[in-house]
Amino acid sequence: MEMRLNAASIWLLILSYGATIAQGERTRDKMYEPIGGASCFRRLNGTHQTGCSSTYSGSVGVLHLINVEADLEFLLSSPPSPPYAPMIPPHLFTRNNLMRLKEAGPKNISVVLLINRTNQMKQFSHELNCPNQYSGLNSTSETCDASNPAKNWNPWGTGLLHEDFPFPIYYIADLDQVTKLEKCFQDFNNHNYETHALRSLCAVEVKSFMSAAVNTEVCMRRTNFINNLGGSKYCDPLEGRNVYATLYPRKPAIENNLETVHTNEKFILVTCRLDTTTMFDGVGLGAMDSLMGFAVFTHVAYLLKQLLPPQSKDLHNVLFVTFNGESYDYIGSQRFVYDMEKLQFPTESTGTPPIAFDNIDFMLDIGTLDDISNIKLHALNGTTLAQQILERLNNYAKSPRYGFNLNIQSEMSAHLPPTSAQSFLRRDPNFNALILNARPTNKYYHSIYDDADNVDFTYANTSKDFTQLTEVNDFKSLNPDSLQMKVRNVSSIVAMALYQTITGKEYTGTKVANPLMADEFLYCFLQSADCPLFKAASYPGSQLTNLPPMRYISVLGGSQESSGYTYRLLGYLLSQLQPDIHRDNCTDLPLHYFAGFNNIGECRLTTQNYSHALSPAFLIDGYDWSSGMYSTWTESTWSQFSARIFLRPSNVHQVTTLSVGIVVLIISFCLVYIISSRSEVLFEDLPASNAALFG
């Protein structure tokens, strides 16, 4: 009977303990409520650290809503219960306001929340006025005049993307979450400010601790030292993949058992930027800052493929390259130039001969097309080639046959836009590099708000065949003023000019780029990767995500989905159909099996491949990190990003709790001392039978 009672007591104790734990978890869940969002994070270069970080255990601040600029004065002039977490709408997220909060220091400001209230927003760009200003033609001077809005490439830039903040900045896009934060502020914080220190307040905790500090040189040294001992990393180089393809398949490097470099092989190099960036992790589509140029680039490639004969020994080849990491001092193009100098592009694994600078006739770099109807042709020097290409472009742009009604102007000077061509001109100012760029009109350059709305994109979703070229007078599916038609017009003009350059004959046909492909392309990259164009360029039955691909360069092991989709896309659009090859035999590259527009599957001979987009600075032993020769950007490692709101006890409550705890601790020590010193009196000796029973 006694044993049963003991067993029952043990089970009761276990159940009571379990109930206590369960109750504790429910209480915790009621105390904290998670808030979804995106965090600012830390990046470093050879001389500085930029971005944000929380404290190791997380940064906590009392919520305070900023409706007008004057509301900041409360936080900056002896607030009653610091630290605070201001909730700032985009139109007040300015350089002046953020630098004032930074100067207030972590004593008063511990967190900044950017809330998605855009009704008063007119601009939002936190890139520099001169992007990549120290990595252009001459690393010791700026590539544009940052002090003169008429002479810089981002007049609305605040430079906050390149500042270092002593507190985390957290972006909250979901309006339901924003409403929840505002309600919590109104219910608990927005009254009786003089008594803030005496009562519980609604607060937020943000965890976004960054491991890296100081600069890339220090961080890489610490990382390499720790790795030698088997530890973890503090930072990683920004690293990705360039994607390239040729118009025609190339001859193999080995002929008759001899390795040959084809010095008579000539290319026109057509390039664009693949990546974009923002202040916040995983947010930012780069619709106007780079996607417009990428769209024109893709359509030029496809139109040339359709207009030119499938094989020709006499015609120039065209090398199409999308560079990754250009937002960070031209990582992709710097590595491309470095590899070409060393005759390491393409790699030996491709089985094709290396391409040298002597193989390149000229480069046409498609830059930022903010105003896609107002484009300039830029060149460092006014060469005969530049004048010739300009005349050909305008010949088609102004031709009544096509009705494009565009006028492409030119500028031949060192005032060049921040595009990949600068990496080539930096090596050799006499290199034949031409740049197509529009005047800057993007008020959301490198920001979270450079999205489909910023370029006025509306998906037509026609379900028609986008792989066929269209007649120039076909306006059935899309409005002539639509973005898709503007992409059609510009890409057709460029492709026609290149067609004439390659063949030596003027283009007289009526076929132009298909605006429906532009419709699908923009939908894939701005709204959903689960789209007809990506499906056609993938293996049959591939499962695609319903989110647009991330185009930030990231690090080794990070997301490279934009490079992957670009690889498939260029492979599909520049390939040659092989109708006689069955699916089972279409397995070894360069053969590739695609779903195709009808999703029935088709074997194609492809020319696309990857090249490494990692700065040469990380390959050179003893590199001088402050030299400015190559990009030195790295990204800090972190463990987690999270945010949650809760009621923070008042200062008086915290002091009272601490005091009670200290008193209880002292009393406990006293009781233990008394019991220990009087143990002979308080505890009698056990009877012999009990002593034997309990050992």
Curated annotation (Swiss-Prot):
Transmembrane parts of this sequence: 655-675
Quaternary data: Component of the gamma-secretase complex, a complex composed of a presenilin (Psn) homodimer, nicastrin (Nct), Aph-1 and Pen-2.
This protein's UniProt keywords: Glycoprotein, Membrane, Notch signaling pathway, Signal, Transmembrane, Transmembrane helix
Primary gene name: Nct
CDD domains registered for this protein in UniProt: M28_Nicastrin
Signal peptide residue numbers: 1-22
Name of this chain's protein: Nicastrin
Cellular compartments annotated: Membrane
GO biological process terms on file: amyloid-beta formation; lateral inhibition; membrane protein ectodomain proteolysis; Notch receptor processing; Notch receptor processing, ligand-dependent; Notch signaling pathway; protein processing; regulation of compound eye photoreceptor development
